[in-house]
Each structure stands twice: as structure tokens, then as C-alpha cells.
Swiss-Prot record:
GO terms for biological process: DNA double-strand break processing; DNA replication; double-strand break repair via homologous recombination; protein complex oligomerization; protein homooligomerization; telomere maintenance. Residues 108-131, 147-174, 380-416, 484-515, 535-580, 1251-1364 are annotated as: Disordered. Binds 1 zinc ion per subunit. This is RecQ-like DNA helicase BLM.
Length: 1364
């Protein structure tokens, strides 16, 4: 291995310590020493053109160039450069020849002496692979920062390029630097020549023709590289370069060369441009200084000697090279075009529609993967017409040739090289010679794109400008014509757009050891949500137009796409509002959760198996997969999801996978029982420890937990049990010591916070779990927590670094409505509303007290509605009985309950939730109302509001013994937030709820766009006028100050009659005859209606202009008297203006929107009838098998089955939620019902469309936590079709459904068993017999016989384990 030469690197590191830590992709400041071009022409020696610095460098006396054999040579002999970090490649020159250093003056005045052309043997380039100098590569640990190399030293017999942020030496010389053929060393048969440099374009022939204005005709990009050829003739180019200086002048040329030297690029002939260019600074968005030179030179327009024929010849050469080389190139194969069109169509599919497809998840993953691959595939990520950046990437193979073309419109020159003529030819490319109008839109365009064909890589460059090229290098136009200054390779394009994307290493360059890319500087927070545009179309950008959205650039585009893109890019900029959602990158709510996405974890395989087999689900909801992966990775998690969002699965699925026991802490026994029943029905070992467990049952559970490998996976406990039971704590300590304590799950975590609506002291003491079990992960879940509550939960539970998963609080299928409450008629109003809107549906009525629950239930029963009361005053057995009857709709349609009911109850078909009294907080109302419509169907949330309830609730808060005054004030604030929600008759109800929880970016036109679920405020007529009522409010405040301030001595000895309630104030303000006081304020509000007057005084209370003080009378009644508020003085001083939304009349509030009567077709009536019959069937089967009827088929699945009206099993299996196992269990009865409606059967296509259509809201939400089943097509149904034609009158389910097993406790059936599984003339067959294609005939058409009787050994009725 070649040894690294000694140098003063350490000294440079000390001089420049900050470079290594800075961003390597930032633009380095211009150094004082720049390179210039000098030439010395000698009749005997080949001219050597190199980069000569103005001053000497500290590394001048050090030689970092070694030969490949590792030996050192002394200066000034030519040396071989060792490759450091793969940024330098070996140069083979013959030693003994001194470097040709010449003065700039000779170069400027243009010596016309000819050079001796090198021989073919000496000029032959030695091809080297990527790993040619691998042995001389120094590891990154030793050379981690090349920024400290300042190689502005005179390079001996070689040319300086740029490597990293410093110039790099390379074999090839850009024609920008010199268009001569240079010979550095004498002829030698064994040396690789570094002196023959010229442009190539796939071996295009270039004619030798004298040029008068080379400065105006060399449209060479700084990104282009040179390839050494054999036997080249330099004489014409030499004379052209010398002749060109007469037009420009010495000063201009020197200025140009000084500026251009900062962006020159050189590449070696092995197609491995090992260099790292400087990146543009973020703040350097202005035009570079060279543009000023170009602008000055535009005044000197020199006519070109190039004719149209030259342009045509060049165009012909371009057509034969590659698709990306010319605009007139042949259209690629139809297959490639078709594939690109398919990709474009897939990209245009909206995400909402993509999720509905059966393969939508996989297709979305592939589409995202394709976008990422395209974004990283090449630096040429823009569309062909996108000329906003200039960047270049290296080849992946050393055998690839670099071919360049500069197509300059209207005065620009086409520069190409040929291996045949060995000379350069400059052809003028006319605009009309181009097949498309692309050049007309590329006045300031940059390189278009790159396309790989075979083993070659073609670069197509387009220089812009009509007249800008005529007196300046075409290099100026192609690189610096736009407003940004870019350098190739690893450059980060600069854009004024707010949606810029950090540059990523191209995948094509992974084989190239370009190791200067600093991945540590990558910050995922820099990524925007809408920066990934996968459209090939992009606008043509000039120096005055910067694209709003950078595009992903596809590496392979045909000319058809180029022309299409050019035609579409006539606009200045891309309008973000016109971007399709399919082109936008899917929004990531939290980019930090990106590492938890996907299925590449060790637990993923087992997780998906349990997910499908145990829970019967096939698709995760939002944030579920990320939360589950984070939980299984041992992270603390805080999950904030709305009701019905699938919180339970986030800990139940990890609990089944993780070794050990998951402790779930839940506040209510009803919630615990419901969850455990559901898990055991899924054959998941779960149990609970509550106060109603007997000692024997508790001892059995503790015994199971003490075993070496406990069967129990999830243990549900109450917070009171955790805080009070020392036996439970010791059991958890034992599990912890044996590393069998998987995690703690705190459900309904809002109970932890004192700022929440349902604070419980025992929840707050759960922080002892973190103290005792520090290494055990913790998960907190809630559906209602504003930012303050969320922060308090994390603080109380000592979750320092949790993964926070949140979702939108919007429930798009709920309809919110507030009605005025008449206290004595509220029960009758509820009956009237239920009979009108949901006469046969399940619902909940929340009441404030136990007495109201009983009264409401009695009233409903008298009016003919099946209603039962549920509150804490009932015994546990009675509560369980009421809950079970209501869940299964067993003679209980409506349940009248306090707020303690329903938390976590998973009944999907609750069609309405009525609040007969005002809730205590917005959080409580959101949670309680969210128990409606969990199946995605439209449901109602009705609230009867009366301000009288405020006083009652205030008294309840005041009488609470727990908490201090600060806590009580928090509850008062929560209460008045709820009052504000009810009093606000202008703003959308949905918007108010979401704003309370901090979700302020919700669509304000949601209700207008979805009138079916629009709230009452959005549906009502906007007959509101904003009035300035500051004067009236001032009169009210002064009246209160004079009459109701006894404490301040202003009562003037008046009696208790000065204690005025809010209703008394309204009477006085309106001038009512029943007013207590008929002076002062009396009658000043006569212009107000009573409704508006009441609203005005409530507004003053909410705005704290006046306040209410609570008193308890001798009769133990709460009365609120008016007093001055904290903002009253501001009104009196004129510092506060009060606006009031005045309504025309109170009747507009009380009017209900009449239900729209639609003409239903006969088939729709049959669908409703069938749905009702199927629901009754599920209820009967649920009673028999001891499960909830919606666990047989959920309500959404029943609705889709009813819509199909098809008895065919093949059709039913295509419906979401219908599986083979369920058809085996319940198919016979289901088919019997559907056969009654077979004449109304829809085609299969319509059924599939209805069951999975994107427009159906319920279809998107129907996959509840444990109710969805995968709907893959059954194999045995398809095999049955091969056995022959199917009988018309005989159902598939006429044959036996028995499971024949031995005495192993599995399912079994005899011939005389249940009619659901045995028919009269059928024989016993196992399920496997159907899969194999066997079919048993039936002599008679099956009918609905006696309901099946459960057997004790059926596995879906009894878990496989037994612990009691």
C-alpha cells in the first residue's frame, strides 16, 4: 500500500479548526488565491496549460503526490497523486520533465506558435477502475476532513480541480480553462497521458474550423468533464484561444477567469470525478459577479461564423446517441412509455381512495418507495424543463464514458467532441432547428436531465439566452444565467421556495466512494410535508422566477415526456394550489415517528400473525402501527386518540406479543369487564382483579402470576387496587425481578390530571409505579386532553421522554345540536325527539343526578320506550344486568345513566347521545357524546341547555371535599367553557370543540361540505347582527355597582332585596312589570327581546364583566347573586368595547330543521327490511353463543350484506367483515334470510363498489378494533365450482358444518346436533374436507330450524386456558 507523504496537515487543522465542524454542504468563502490560465507556446514543446495561483501555499514544499508503487519522488518532478478519501486519483506522468509554468501575459496576447501533437501511443489513456488506487486510500478515521487542504499551490504537471471545498487535482482539463491540447510530459510508452483533454459527445465527429470568437462560442458548463483521447490535434484550438482574446481584452478575460476558477470541474478519463464541490451558502441567493461581466459583454455582439448547416450536422449527431441527448431523439420503446404512464396514473390516486383498495397499503408503500428512490436516484431529479439548478453526479462504473452536449439557442454554440476528427467543432444551433419549442423557454436554463443507456451516461446541457452568449463564454449562460450559483456533484440546490428539500446522496453514486457527504448534518425536521412532487412536469425558471416546489427528477424520461413538459412549462411558477394531492408526499404528523413505521422489526412477523388470526383485523388505523412498534421497542408512549380511534389495540396487541404480563389500569369496573370479555372471546388470556372478586378467585389469579411462565398476558386492575393492595404490589415486584413485567398501561389517563374533567386522587398516586419499577415502559391513553392536561399527565406520571401519538379530534359522522331546555318538560322532549328521529335505535341519555336518571327512565317507559336506569346507586349485579340488556338490545333500547356509564363501552350502533343536563366540562361532553356512532354511521349528539344547570353544577363543585380552591377554580373554568359552547350560536359547534383541544387548522367549511352531519349553527339561518352594546353594558355595570355591592358599602342600608339574580336583572333591564326595582336601569333594554337580553347578561358573566356569587339558602338551595366582575372597571373607564351578536327572535333558536323526506325506491325498502331481519338474527345468535350480537357481524357489515341481498357465498366473502370462519359458524341462517331477497340481488361489481367505495364514510371507519375480519376469497368455494353446475334451489350451506374431532376438546358435532351445522341427509364433514373440494349433496332445501345450542367444548365460547 502506498505510503502517505508527510505534510503539514496537522498545522492546517490547527489553523482551520472550525471547518471540520461546519456543514460540508455550505459554500466556502472565496479564497484570496484563485487560479488563472497561462500559456506558453513553444515550437518544440507541447504547451502546458495549468492553473497557476497568485500566491504560494503552505503546502508548496510538500508533495502529497505519490506513484502507484508507493515510492516518493522529489520536486519538481512529476508525481503520482495518492487518493485520499477517494477524492484524488493517480496521475501517471513521466518524471524528469519540469513543469511548464508560464505567465498570464503570454496567454493573453495569444502566441500563435503550434504545438507538437502527441503520438497516439503516448496519448492513449489508461483506463482505470474505481478501485484502481484502492490500496492507497486512507481511511476516513485518519482523513475525516479534506477542508483543511488548501491546494492553491502550483501543481506540478497537473491541473487543479476542486475536492471537497478545496481545489482538486485531476487528469482532465475543462475546456473552460483551455481549449488546447496540452502535453505535460514527453512521450513515453508506459505513461498515462494527462495532456490530451477535449470534450466528447459519444464520439461525435467534430470538424476543424477556425473561430474568431471562442469566448462567445464555448457554452461549456462547469459541470462538464473531460476525457483524454489519443492523437489529438491542438493547433486550431490554440489559435482560437489566442485569437479570442483580441475581442475581450486582457482585463475582462482575467476577471472572468478569476471568477470561473472557483467553479471549474475536472474529471479523469476513468469517469470517476472524485471531488467534492463547495456548496452554495443559504444566504447567497443573489447573482454571482460573473453575471455582471456577462451583462457588460453583451454590449459587444460579434456575429458568429457558424451556419445553419453546422447546427443541422450537430443535431444529427445528437440524435444517434441517447434519448436524453437531443430533443429530436427517437421515442423510446412503447413499454417504457407505458410504464411511465402507469406510474403517473398511480401517483394521481388520492390517498383517501388508495386506502380503500384491498392492496392499497402495499401500493402506497411501493409508491412512497418509488418517490424516495427517484429523489435519491440522481442529482438530476428535476423534470427536463426544470432549469432551476445545475448539478452533476458521477458515474457508477469506470467504463462509462462522459458525453456532453451544450445546446445553446439562438447564438449559443453546440460544443462537441469526436474521436474521429480529433478537433473541436463549434456549431451554431438555431432555434428553428430544434424539434420542439423547448429552447424558446430556456433563456436561462440549466442542464436538463441525465439518462443512462447501456454502459454510457449522457448529459444534456442547454445554455440559455438569445444574446447573452454572443460575447461571453457559453459557460456563463449555462451555469450562471439563473439567479442561483450552483456547483456540481454533492451540491444542495438553493431555492427561494419554502418547500426545499435537503440533498441526499444519489443511489447511482453509492459505488463511488464519495465520502465527503456529511450525513450527520441531515436533520429530518428540515423535511417538508409537501416537497416530494413526483410529477415530471416542472416550470421553466428564469433568473427572476424561482420554483415554489422542487421536483423529483426521474432518471429516464423519453423525448415525448420532454416535449410534454416543455409545453406545460410556459408559466412562470408552479401554483401550489393546483398541485394534486396525489403528487404530494403523505403528510407525516410527526417525522420523529418515521423510525416506528413499517414491518421491519423482529416482532413484525408475529405481530401480523396475531393481528390477523386473533383480532381478525387486516388494516391498521392512523398511528396504531407506529404506537405498537414503539411500545414493543420499550418506549414510553402517550396516545391521544378520539373515541373509537382504536386505543385498546395499541396495548392489547403488544401484550399478546411481549413475554410477561401487561398491567392495565382502568378506572371503571364496567370498562374492565367489557374489555376482558372481549379478549377472552378472542382466546386471549386476560383477567382482572377488582373488589368483587372472591378470595378464591383472587388466589387463583395470584397463583398464575407466580408461575415460571404465567399464562395471563393482560391483567386489568383499578387504580384503587394498585394503591391499596400490598399483595398486588408484591406480586408485581416478583414479576419485575423475574423480568416478566412487560409494561404498565394507564387507560383514561386524563383522570391523572387535576386540570382534567374527571380527576381521581388514586390516579395521581400512580407515579409510585415509576419509582418502584423504573425500567418498565409505561403507556398512557386518553381521548380527551387539551395541551395543559397532556403536559400535566406526563409530569405526574414522570414520563420524561415519551413518544406522543395524537390524532385529529374530529368525529366526522357526528351531528352536534343544542336545544333550549325546559326543566319540567325535558323528559317529554326527549321522548318526542327519539320517536321522531330514532324510534328503533339504541341511545344514551345522560342525567346530572341519580334521581333524574330514575325519573327519566320512568317517563320513557310510560311513553312506550324500553328504557332502564344506570347509576352508582345500583348494586353491581344490577348494573351488569342493565348494561348487558342494553348492549344486546334485549328489551332495553335507551339507557338513562350518569356520567359514570359508558366509558370504554364498545357498542358500535349507538345512534344518539342526549344530554338532559349540562355537562361539567367540554372534555366530558366530547367523551360522552363520542360514544355515539362508533361504527361510522351518522349519529346525533343532542344537548338540552339551560343556564339554571350552571348554578346546580357550581354547587356540586363547591361541595366537593377533595381539592383546594385552585382546583375548584379550574372546575369552574371548565364549566364556563361548556357554557360558552352552548351560548355561542354563531360559530360551528365542531370548530368550537376542536379549538378547545388545540386543533386550530380544521376546515371551517366542513359542515357546509357535509350537510348530513352539519351542526345546528351551520344549518341555521345566519340572522345575526353584530352590535356595539358598550353603552348598555356600561349602564348595567353602574347599576350593579350602585345596588348590588353591599360589601363595598354602597348598599346604603338597603334590605336583602338588593341581592339580585341574573333573571331579576333581565326583568329590570327589559322593564318587566314583575321587576323588583323599577328605577335606574329599568326599561333601558326594552328594545331587546327576552331571549337576547338573557344572552347578553350571560355574555357579561362569561366575559367576567359581572360575576355571580353562590349562596346556600335555608332550604338547602343554591342561589347565585350578581356582583361586580373583574373587568367591570375597564368598561366604566372606557377601555373595553363589547360587541354582541343580536338575533332577530328566539324562535330561530328553537326551530328544528325539518327532516328531508326522500322518495325511497322499492329496493331500498327491501334493503332496510333485510337489514332489520339480519340484525335480529345476530341478536338471537348472540344470545345462544353468549357473545354480543355485533361481534357476530358488526353493524357496518350487516348493512353491506343487506345492500347486496345476495345469498351467494362468493359474493359475501367479498364484503369487508365476512370471513370463512364466520360463514362456517353462522352461514346457514344468514343464507336463509338472504334467499328471501335474492330477486333483488345486485351485480358483484356494484356490491364491491358499495362495500369499499371511498365516498362512504362509514366504510372507512367500519373496521372497529376487533370487529373487522379479513375478506380474502375462500379457496374451497372456488374449488367447488369445478365440481359441476350448482343447483339453483340448493344453498351451499345445505351441507354439514360439523367439525369432527376426537376427545381433545376441539369442536365436534354429531348428526343429531344443531341444525346450523347438521342437515337431515348430510354426513359429518370437517372444514378441511371443504377446502379440499369435497361436496356433500342435500336432498332438501335448507330452512331455518331450531336455533343452535352451544356445546361446552367450542373454543370460541371458552378460552383454551383455565385458571378458575
Amino acid at each position: 500500500m502506498a505510503a502517505l507523504p508527510q505534510n503539514n496537515l496537522q498545522k492546517q487543522l490547527e489553523l482551520f479548526p472550525a471547518k471540520g465542524t461546519s456543514n460540508k454542504l455550505s459554500l466556502q468563502k472565496t479564497k484570496s488565491s484563485v487560479f488563472t490560465f497561462k500559456k506558453k507556446c513553444s515550437p518544440n514543446v507541447s504547451a502546458s496549460t495549468g492553473f497557476i495561483p497568485f500566491q504560494q501555499h503552505v503546502l508548496k514544499d510538500k508533495n502529497v503526490n505519490v506513484k502507484q508503487d508507493g515510492t516518493h519522488t522529489a520536486l519538481p518532478k512529476a508525481t503520482e497523486r495518492n487518493k485520499i478519501n477517494c477524492f484524488f486519483t493517480p496521475v501517471y506522468t513521466k518524471s524528469g520533465q519540469p513543469p511548464q509554468v508560464v505567465a498570464l501575459k503570454d496567454h493573453v496576447h495569444g502566441n500563435d506558435s503550434a504545438n507538437k501533437p502527441p503520438s497516439t501511443e503516448d496519448a492513449a489513456s489508461k483506463k482505470t477502475g474505481i478501485n484502481t488506487s484502492f490500496g492507497s486510500v486512507t481511511s476516513l478515521e485518519e482523513w475525516d476532513d479534506l477542508d483543511d487542504f488548501d491546494t492553491s499551490v502550483s501543481p506540478p504537471k497537473s491541473h487543479a480541480g476542486k475536492g471537497g471545498k478545496t481545489p482538486q487535482k485531476c487528469k482532465n482539463t475543462s475546456p473552460v480553462a483551455s481549449f488546447k491540447i496540452q502535453s505535460i510530459s514527453p512521450e513515453g510508452p508506459t505513461t498515462e497521458k494527462h495532456d490530451c483533454a477535449k470534450l466528447l459527445y459519444d464520439n461525435n465527429e467534430v470538424a476543424s474550423e477556425p473561430r474568431k470568437n471562442l469566448h462567445a462560442k464555448t457554452a461549456e458548463s462547469p459541470d462538464q468533464s473531460l476525457v483524454c483521447l489519443a492523437s489529438v490535434e491542438p493547433t486550431n484550438l490554440e489559435r482560437d484561444m489566442c485569437r479570442n482574446t483580441d475581442y475581450l481584452g486582457t482585463d475582462d478575460l482575467e476577471h472572468d477567469q478569476e471568477t470561473l476558477s472557483q467553479v471549474l470541474i475536472e474529471e479523469e478519463d476513468d469517469c470517476e470525478p472524485d471531488f467534492i464541490p463547495p456548496s452554495p451558502s443559504d444566504e447567497s441567493l443573489s447573482s454571482p459577479p460573473v453575471l455582471k461581466v456577462i451583462s457588460a459583454q453583451r454590449k459587444h455582439k460579434v456575429s458568429s461564423l457558424t451556419d445553419v448547416n453546422d447546427c443541422e450536422n450537430t443535431t444529427d449527431h445528437l440524435q444517434g446517441q441517447s434519448v436524453s441527448t437531443s430533443l429530436d431523439s427517437k421515442v423510446p420503446s412503447q413499454l417504457l412509455t407505458l410504464m411511465l404512464e402507469i406510474c403517473d396514473l398511480v401517483d394521481k390516486i388520492p390517498i383517501s381512495e388508495l386506502h380503500v383498495l384491498s392492496c392499497g397499503l402495499d401500493l402506497k408503500k411501493k409508491r412512497d418507495m418509488r418517490k424516495r428512490l427517484l429523489s435519491n436516484d440522481s442529482v438530476f431529479r428535476s423534470s427536463p424543463a426544470d432549469s432551476s439548478t445545475v448539478s452533476l453526479t458521477s458515474c457508477t462504473s469506470s467504463t462509462q464514458n462522459r458525453d456532453f452536449n451544450v445546446n445553446a439557442p439562438k447564438g449559443a454554440e453546440s460544443l462537441s467532441g469526436s474521436s474521429v476528427s480529433k478537433v473541436f467543432k463549434f456549431n451554431k444551433l438555431a432555434v428553428h432547428d430544434i424539434g420542439t419549442k423547448e429552447s424558446e423557454n430556456s433563456a436561462n436554463s440549466a442542464p436538463n436531465f441525465m439518462e443512462k443507456i447501456g454502459n454510457k451516461t449522457s448529459f444534456s446541457f442547454r445554455a440559455g439566452g438569445d444574446s447573452i452568449m454572443e460575447n461571453s463564454f457559453n459557460f456563463h449562460s449555462s451555469v450562471l444565467s439563473n439567479s442561483r450559483f450552483n456547483t456540481p456533484q454533492n451540491e444542495k440546490p438553493i431555492s427561494s421556495s419554502t418547500c426545499t428539500r435537503p440533498y441526499s446522496q444519489p443511489i447511482d453514486d453509492m459505488d463511488n466512494p464519495d465520502l465527503d457527504f456529511d450525513i450527520d448534518n441531515f436533520d429530518i425536521e428540515d423535511l417538508d410535508d409537501i416537497h416530494c412532487l413526483d410529477s415530471p412536469a416542472a416550470p421553466s425558471v428564469s433568473s427572476k422566477n424561482v420554483p415554489q416546489y422542487p421536483t423529483i427528477r426521474e432518471a429516464q424520461l423519453d423525448s415525448r415526456n420532454k416535449e410534454k413538459n416543455t409545453r406545460n412549462n410556459t408559466g412562470d411558477t408552479t401554483n401550489p394550489s393546483l398541485l394534486s394531492d396525489s403528487l404530494l408526499k403523505p403528510q407525516i404528523e410527526n417525522p420523529a415517528h418515521e423510525r416506528f413505521r413499517g414491518f421491519n422489526f423482529p416482532h413484525s412477523k408475529e405481530m401480523m400473525k396475531i393481528f390477523h388470526k386473533k383480532f381478525g383485523l387486516h388494516r391498521f388505523r392512523t398511528n396504531q402501527l407506529e404506537a405498537i412498534n414503539a411500545c414493543l421497542c420499550g418506549e414510553d408512549c402517550f396516545i391521544l386518540m378520539p373515541t373509537g380511534g382504536g386505543k385498546s389495540l395499541c396495548y392489547q396487541l403488544p401484550g399478546c406479543i411481549s413475554p410477561g404480563v401487561t398491567i392495565v389500569i382502568s378506572p371503571l369496573r364496567s370498562l374492565i369487564v367489557d374489555q376482558v370479555q372481549k379478549l377472552t372471546s378472542l382466546d386471549i388470556p386476560a383477567t382482572y382483579l377488582t373488589g368483587d372478586k372472591t378470595d378464591a378467585e383472587a388466589a387463583s389469579i395470584y397463583l398464575q402470576l407466580s408461575k415460571k411462565d404465567p399464562i395471563i398476558k393482560l391483567l386489568y386492575v383499578t387504580p384503587e387496587k394498585v394503591c391499596a393492595s400490598t399483595r398486588l404490589i408484591s406480586t408485581m415486584e416478583n414479576l419485575y425481578e423475574r423480568q416478566l413485567l412487560a409494561r404498565f398501561v394507564i387507560d383514561e389517563a386524563h383522570c391523572v390530571s387535576q386540570w382534567g374533567h374527571d380527576f381521581r386522587p388514586d390516579y395521581k398516586r400512580l407515579n409510585v409505579l415509576r419509582q418502584k419499577f423504573q425500567s418498565v415502559p409505561m403507556m398512557a391513553l386518553t381521548a380527551t386532553a387539551n395541551p395543559r392536561v397532556k403536559k400535566d399527565i406526563l409530569n405526574q406520571l414522570k414520563m420524561t421522554k415519551p413518544q406522543i401519538f395524537t390524532m385529529s379530534f374530529n368525529r366526522d359522522n357526528l351531528k352536534y345540536e343544542v336545544l333550549p331546555k325546559k326543566p319540567k318538560r325535558v323528559a317529554l322532549d326527549c321522548v318526542e325527539w327519539i320517536k321522531k328521529h330514532h324510534p328503533n335505535d339504541s341511545g344514551i341519555i345522560y342525567c346530572l343526578s341519580r334521581h333524574e336518571c330514575d325519573t327519566m327512565a320512568d317517563t320513557l317507559q310510560k311513553e312506550g320506550l324500553a328504557a332502564l336506569a344506570y347509576h352508582a346507586g345500583l348494586a353491581d349485579s344490577n348494573r351488569d344486568y342493565v348494561q348487558h340488556k342494553w348492549i344486546n338490545q334485549d328489551d332495553c333500547q335507551v339507557i338513562c345513566a350518569t356520567i359514570a356509564f359508558g366509558m370504554g363501552i364498545d357498542k358500535p350502533d349507538v345512534r344518539y347521545v342526549i344530554h338532559a343536563s349540562l355537562p361539567k366540562s367540554v372534555e366530558g361532553y366530547y367523551q360522552e357524546s363520542g360514544r355515539a356512532g362508533r361504527d361510522g354511521e351518522t349519529s346525533h349528539c343532542l344537548l338540552f341547555y339551560s343556564y339554571h344547570d350552571v348554578t346546580r353544577i357550581r354547587r356540586l363543585i363547591q361541595m366537593e371535599k377533595d381539592g383546594n380552591s385552585h382546583t375548584k377554580q379550574t372546575h369552574f373554568n371548565n364549566l364556563y367553557s361548556m357554557v360558552h359552547y352552548c351560548e355561542n350560536v354563531v360559530e360551528c359547534r365542531r370548530m368550537q370543540l376542536l379549538s378547545y383541544f388545540g386543533e386550530n387548522n380544521f376546515n371551517p367549511n366542513f359542515c357546509k361540505e357535509h350537510t348530513q352531519v352539519a351542526c345546528d349553527n351551520c344549518l341555521g339561518k345566519k340572522n345575526y347582527k353584530s352590535r356595539d352594546v358598550t353603552d348598555d353594558v356600561g349602564n348595567i355595570v353602574r347599576f350593579v355597582q350602585d345596588n348590588c355591592s353591599l360589601v363595598q358599602g354602597r348598599g346604603k342600608g338597603r334590605s336583602n332585596n338588593t341581592r339580585l339574580t341574573l333573571n331579576m336583572m333581565v326583568d329590570i333591564f327589559l322593564g318587566s312589570k314583575s321587576a323588583k326595582i323599577q328605577t335606574g336601569l329599568f326599561g333601558k333594554g326594552a328594545a331587546y327581546s327576552r331571549h337576547n337580553a338573557e344572552r347578553l347578561f350571560r355574555k357579561l358573566v362569561l366575559d367576567r364583566i359581572i360575576d355571580e356569587e353562590l349562596y346556600i339558602t335555608f332550604n338547602d338551595q343554591a342561589v347565585a347573586y350578581v356582583k361586580m366582575g373583574e373587568r367591570a372597571q375597564a368598561v366604566l373607564n372606557g377601555f373595553l368595547k363589547v360587541d354582541f351578536q343580536d338575533t332577530e327572535s328566539a324562535s330561530s333558536i328553537r326551530k328544528q330543521k325539518a327532516s328531508v323526506v326522500t322518495n325511497t325506491s322499492q329496493r331500498e325498502e327491501m334493503v332496510k327490511k333485510c337489514q332489520a331481519e339480519l340484525t335480529e338474527l345476530c341478536k338471537r345468535l348472540g344470545k345462544i353463543f353468549g357473545v354480543h350480537y355485533f361481534n357476530i357481524f358488526n353493524t357496518a357489515t350487516i348493512r353491506r350484506i343487506a345492500e347486496s341481498l345476495s345469498p351467494e357465498p362468493e359474493v359475501l366473502l367479498q364484503i369487508d367483515g365476512v370471513t370463512e370462519d364466520k360463514l362456517d359458524k353462522y352461514g346457514a341462517e344468514l343464507i336463509d334470510v338472504l334467499q328471501k331477497y335474492s330477486e333483488w340481488t345486485l351485480p358483484v361489481e356494484d356490491i364491491c363498489q358499495k362495500s369499499g367505495g371511498p365516498a362512504n364514510v362509514s366504510a372507512r371507519r367500519s373496521n372497529s378494533d376487533h370487529d373487522d375480519e379479513s375478506c380474502d376469497k375462500s379457496s374451497y368455494f372456488s374449488s367447488n365450482n369445478k365440481k359441476g353446475p350448482k343447483r339453483k334451489n340448493s344453498s351451499y350451506f345445505g351441507k354439514s358444518k360439523k367439525r369432527k374431532t376426537g376427545g381433545d376438546g376441539q369442536q365436534s358435532r354429531s348428526k343429531n346436533g344443531n341444525s346450523s351445522y347438521a342437515r337431515k341427509n348430510s354426513t359429518a364433514k370437517t372444514s378441511s374436507s371443504y377446502i379440499s373440494g369435497s361436496k356433500t349433496g342435500a336432498d332438501k332445501r335448507p330452512g331455518f330450524m331450531a336455533p343452535p345450542m352451544p356445546q361446552p367444548n367450542r373454543r370460541f365460547l371458552k378460552p383454551s386456558y383455565s385458571m378458575f
